From Swiss-Prot:
GO terms for molecular function: ATP binding; metal ion binding; protein-exporting ATPase activity. GO terms for cellular component: cell envelope Sec protein transport complex; cytosol; plasma membrane. This is Protein translocase subunit SecA. Residues 1024-1098 are annotated as: Disordered. May bind 1 zinc ion per subunit. Keywords: ATP-binding, Cell inner membrane, Cell membrane, Cytoplasm, Membrane, Metal-binding, Nucleotide-binding, Protein transport, Translocase, Translocation, Transport, Zinc. It comes from the Bacteria. Gene3D superfamilies: Helical scaffold and wing domains of SecA (1.10.3060.10), P-loop containing nucleotide triphosphate hydrolases (3.40.50.300), SecA, preprotein cross-linking domain (3.90.1440.10). It is found in: Cell inner membrane; Cytoplasm.
Length: 1098
């Protein structure tokens, strides 16, 4: 007995322990279920109202205290408000804790209600209940599943979802109740494909929606979010819970705001994230769409939290400098360089073949060196890959590589200097050699055009020059830094263009559609709309392909999906495959993965991998296997890793006259139709990775008899998870099926990470071309290679998250302060803190004249102490004295502002109040005039104090936005510059953390300084009532100036999962929408005409 088995026997494995913990909950649900099943339809709905009340009452006391405290804010002195807000925050936390406890109390009843509602819909074509206002509202909106007859609402059991007429036929199994408990507890439920994850989510969604705080159901693409909101919606709406989907409405619209106010909101991960960013660019509270982040269930959670983890959401705008033409200018040089390297690599390969075939040992050594050079020149060269698969060749080349790698790569330049540039596939890097630099510099006047100067030694040499004045030194320094920045940009552009030519292949990593370069998601084969490679790489590919190079942009707001989802009070997720990444999900998100057993045992047969020497043999074997399956009458799903391979297999099948469908990034519009047919007899479907497709393949009875769906993988993926997802397409709900992967030593995974050992095994066993090896040892070896890649990818993601965590702390602080300013409730408290900060800063300046100047410039007042007092008193006391004087000065000025404005406001309101909602009030700080928009009614009711609040808000928002935008740019530049620290044996992350603190402090000082200096000087020029004019609407920045994108910061060969599905939805049947004539009876059942009832606003 092994150690792990012994420990397992002693303590039980994790799956057993998880089930043991959840089973009592499921037993409770099953115990209350008979009682719930006995209730009439009306009683069942009344039960939901009862549970809502129970939850609401559990924290009623705390809610009452919060309202009381909020009522005291306006009458409390500014300095003392902080204590009230701290109490409110503490009480709000207590409310959430009370709600969680109450939810646990009612869980068995709530889950039983959902299960029995599902049963009633599946067993009855119609459910008749007493009509409520909510039922009438739904009927008036034209929902096809409910109609009103007198005082009754008739709910049907079929409705339109995703363009299809769905008849409800599902009831929750016990394993789905297990899954529901796991999700409610804030964990990840791993459930096999076909186990009904969508139905499982109805349980915790219903339960948590009872609080009224909102539940977000997050999907990976807009087709699924719309379909699921329509499919599951009536189950919730039957119980009076509102349901909406943000993807059905335009950003920043009232409809989207209403969608967030619904009890249950569906949407894609991107749109939730972008709405958060847009909210933090809003200039008025009425522009906000989201409310507090309460509870989210993420579908395909591994795809969102792991694959998308290196992909920040970014809202950017145009940069003031003109369009950058550098990529266009340098493209011909790089093209020449690439062609020269291609010739060189071909020559080295020809020399290698000739020399290795010789009997002379010296010739053979020379031959393997030439082969190694050809490999370093262009590792993806197809003739090279084919030659490396021959017996003993790869082993010989690896031996040569070891010789040159000895003593920390000491001899490597001997091998690589004859090349123009060197490619390292594993590191995803391209480095120019001196020979390459000479070629692109050519006849240029400056031979150092593409060589970065040693800026450190140049600067220290400048410091030591004695014959220059300080001013001349500064001018020279500026010149050096400018020259360095220009050259750095030029070298960076060359490097990115080289990557575009040498490491990115069209129709593999990207496609060109309608004159645009679009990234293909390597996990799912979908086009990733709106996503661009970062760091100039996308522009480089655009230049290579001869399409329009997009202009450079500047970031206005950004967040990674991980940091967005960490804001939720409670987070859970569902997926078919998370166990392999359980460590990462726990490490980063503290999310526990619980594997839910299948409802029926899996009958799928998973076979060992079949390994061939070359891709040609592998594809030949794949076609023969497909042919065999078609003869047996089994449907076949062929999983490929790129568009190119799917098209090549399609041509091979067409030559054999085998009918088939292709599903890839170029043909995704037909996806739903193709998947619907994929389970029919002898149907062959070729699909680029099926991860996250969200549609089950259903089998006909004759197919089940023939052996079920056959899955054929044409290549092992870097991630075991994607392979498991492909396998999981077969064998749903106990159906028969099989899966097998065909692998060749030329595949990327094998070439980069695993094939040395397998190649030597095949050589020893004397395998000839065309022969195949199938052994558990080989499959294990491939899995080890995948683990190696996964660990490497985890390291990259963790590192990126550590960088983003630094930015996230700053983002939270800035956005909190911005929200205070926007809502106006806590703005006074923030301004008091800013004034204190400026006072404390001023008294620390050391020299009395400097202190005097600082107080005069920032606080717009005389220094409140003498020079003698300054030298004698403690700094804390001086700060306190200055603060007291500053606050008195500030109150006097704001009171004066309100007094001057009030007579004018009073007159305008009383005489023209019906004409204006908002008016413009001009305020000046002596340098510039600010036109402040103020609500006329609020200004009248507060005797002018609202003007002060609006002035404070406008100045603070403007200052924060400018400073944050600048800070983001500086953080971006810092992130690039700290990477050089690794050459000095320093940790770039540590340097980044230290430097970013300085940047943040500078930004906070800038915000405080600029805000206070304007507020302290603000005054209203005396104005006559007839000069008052109506305020224009708040200036929301024009949307066309902004670009919303997901930038991919990752290695292109480890792309993240798709999030935008633009498939064509089938035409809806005519009966989907009920049109009501203006004079027809209103569908709500009120008896009034439609035009006089719900049709008034239509």
């Amino acid at each position: 007995m092994g150690f792990n088995e012994f420990i397992g026997k002693l303590f039980g494995n994790k799956a057993t322990r998880d089930m043991k913990e959840i089973k009592p909950w499921v037993d409770k649900i099953k115990a209350v279920y008979p009682e719930i099943a006995k209730l009439s339809n009306d009683e069942l709905r009344a039960k939901t109202v009862e549970l809502k009340k129970y939850i609401s009452d559990s924290a009623a006391e705390e809610q009452k205290k919060i309202e009381e405290l909020k009522g005291t804010i306006e009458t409390t002195e500014l300095e003392d408000r902080e204590g009230i807000f701290a109490q409110i925050d503490k009480l709000e936390k207590e409310v959430l804790e009370k709600y969680e406890k109450a939810l646990d109390d009612v869980l068995p009843q709530a889950f039983a209600i959902v299960k029995d509602t599902a049963r009633r819909f599946s067993e009855n074509p119609e459910l008749v209940v007493t009509a409520t206002d909510f039922d009438r509202e739904l009927a008036a909106q034209g929902k096809d599943f409910v109609r009103i007859e007198d005082d009754k609402a008739i709910w049907q059991n079929h409705w339109i979802a995703g363009g299809n007429d769905m008849v409800w036929s599902m009831v929750h199994y016990d394993v789905q109740l297990f899954g529901g408990v796991v999700l409610h507890k804030g964990k990840i439920a791993e459930m096999a494909t076909g186990e009904g994850k969508t139905l499982v989510a109805t349980l915790p969604v219903f339960l948590n929606a009872l609080t009224g705080n909102g539940v977000h159901v997050v999907t990976v693409n807009d087709y699924l979010s719309k379909r699921d909101s329509e499919w599951m919606g009536p189950l919730y709406q039957f119980h009076g819970l509102s349901v909406d989907c943000i993807d059905k409405h335009q950003p920043n619209s009232d409809a989207r705001r209403r969608a967030y106010m619904a009890d249950i909101t569906f949407g894609t991960n991107n749109e939730f994230g972008f709405d958060y960013l847009r909210d933090n660019m809003a200039v008025s509270p009425k522009d906000l769409v989201q409310r507090k982040h309460n509870y989210a269930i993420v579908d395909e959670v591994d795809s969102v939290l792991i694959d998308d983890a290196r992909t920040p959401l970014i809202i950017s705008g145009p940069v003031p400098k003109g369009e950058d033409q550098l990529f266009e200018q340098l493209r011909p040089l790089v093209e020449r360089l690439f062609e020269a390297q291609k010739k060189l690599a071909t020559q080295y390969l020809a020399d290698a073949k000739r020399l290795i075939a010789s009997d002379d040992k010296k010739d053979q050594e020379e031959g393997f060196l030439a082969l190694f050079r050809s490999h370093k020149a262009l590792p993806k060269n197809k003739p090279l890959i084919k030659f490396l698969s021959e017996q003993g060749i790869k082993a010989g080349m690896l031996k040569t590589e070891e010789i040159y790698m000895e003593q920390n790569n000491k001899r490597m330049p001997e091998a690589t200097d004859p090349l123009y540039f060197v490619i390292d596939e594993k590191q995803n890097s391209v480095d120019l050699t001196d020979k390459g630099i000479d070629l692109i510099t050519g006849n240029a006047a400056d031979p150092t055009l593409f060589v970065l100067p040693d800026i450190t030694s140049q600067l220290s040499a400048l410091e030591n020059e004695t014959d220059l004045t300080e001013e001349e030194k500064l001018a020279k320094k500026d010149e050096l830094m400018t020259n360095y920045a220009i050259k750095s940009e030029r070298v960076h552009t060359i490097n990115q263009l080289l990557k575009a030519y040498a490491m990115f292949e069209k129709d593999d990593e990207y496609v060109v559609i309608d004159g645009q370069v679009k990234i293909v998601d390597e996990q799912t084969g979908r086009i990733m709309e709106g996503r661009r490679y970062s760091d100039g790489l996308h522009q480089a590919i655009e230049a290579k392909e001869g399409v329009k190079v997009e202009a450079a942009t500047q970031t206005f707001a950004t967040i990674t999906l991980q940091n967005y989802f960490r804001m939720y009070h409670k987070l859970s997720g569902m997926t078919g495959t998370a166990e392999t990444e359980a460590g990462e999900l726990w490490d980063i998100y503290k999310l526990d993965v619980v594997v839910i057993p299948t409802n029926r045992p899996i009958a799928r047969k998973d076979m060992n991998d079949r390994v061939y020497k070359t891709k040609r043999e592998k594809y030949k074997a794949v076609i023969e296997e497909i042919e065999e399956m078609v003869k047996e009458g089994r449907p076949v799903l062929v999983g490929t890793t790129s568009v190119e391979i799917s098209e090549m297999l399609s041509k091979m099948l067409a030559m054999r006259k085998i009918e088939h469908n292709v599903l890839n990034a170029k043909l995704h519009q037909r996806e739903a139709d193709i998947v619907a047919q994929a389970g029919q007899k002898s149907i062959v479907t070729i699909a680029t990775n099926m991860a996250g497709r969200g549609t089950d393949i259903k089998l006909s009875p004759e197919v089940k008899a023939a052996g079920g769906l056959a899955i054929i993988g044409t290549e092992r993926h870097e991630s075991r998870r994607v392979d498991r997802q492909l396998r999981g397409r077969a064998g749903r709900q106990g159906d028969p099926g099989s899966s097998v992967f065909f692998v060749s030593l030329e595949d990327d995974l094998m070439r980069l990470f695993s094939s040395d050992r397998i190649a030597s095994v095949m050589d020893k066993l004397g395998f000839k071309e065309g022969e195949m090896i199938e052994h558990k040892m080989i499959s294990n070896s491939i899995e080890r290679a995948q683990k190696k890649v996964e660990e490497n990818n985890f390291g990259i993601r963790k590192r990126l998250l550590e960088y983003d965590d630094v930015m996230n702390k700053q983002r939270v602080a800035v956005y909190t302060k911005r929200r205070h300013a926007l809502m106006g409730e806590r703005i006074g408290m923030d301004i008091v803190n800013m004034i204190w900060d400026r006072c404390a800063y001023a008294v620390e300046l050391g020299d009395f004249d400097n202190v005097k100047m600082e107080i005069l410039q920032t606080l717009a007042m005389e220094v409140p102490f003498t020079e003698e007092e300054y030298n004698k008193m403690r700094k804390e006391d001086l700060a306190e004295k200055t603060f007291e004087a500053a606050m008195n000065n500030f109150k006097r000025k704001t009171d004066r502002m309100a007094q001057i404005a009030n007579p004018v406001i009073k007159q305008v309101y009383e005489m023209q109040g019906h004409m204006y909602e908002n008016i413009m009030i001009p305020i000046t700080d002596g340098k510039r005039l600010y036109n402040i928009s103020v609500n006329l009614k609020a200004a009248y009711e507060t005797e002018g104090k609202e003007i002060v609040k609006s002035f404070e808000k406008a100045i603070l928002l403007h200052t924060i936005d400018d400073a944050w935008k600048e800070n983001l740019r500086e953080l971006d530049e810092l992130k690039h510059s700290v990477q050089n620290a690794s050459y000095e044996q320093k940790d770039p992350l540590l340097i980044f953390k230290l430097e970013s603190v300085n940047l943040f402090d500078n930004m906070v000082n800038k915000i405080n300084n600029n805000t206070i200096s304007v507020l302290m000087r603000g005054q209203i020029p005396v104005q006559e009532p007839e000069q008052v004019r109506e305020a224009a609407p708040e200036p929301q920045a024009p949307r066309q100036q902004y670009r919303e994108e997901k930038q991919d910061l990752s290695d292109p060969h480890q792309q993240a999962a798709a999030e935008h599905d633009t498939r064509e939805v089938k035409r809806e049947p005519v009966r989907a929408e009920k049109t009501v004539g203006r004079n027809d009876p209103c569908p709500c059942g009120s008896g009034k005409k439609y035009k006089n009832c719900h049709g008034q606003n239509a």
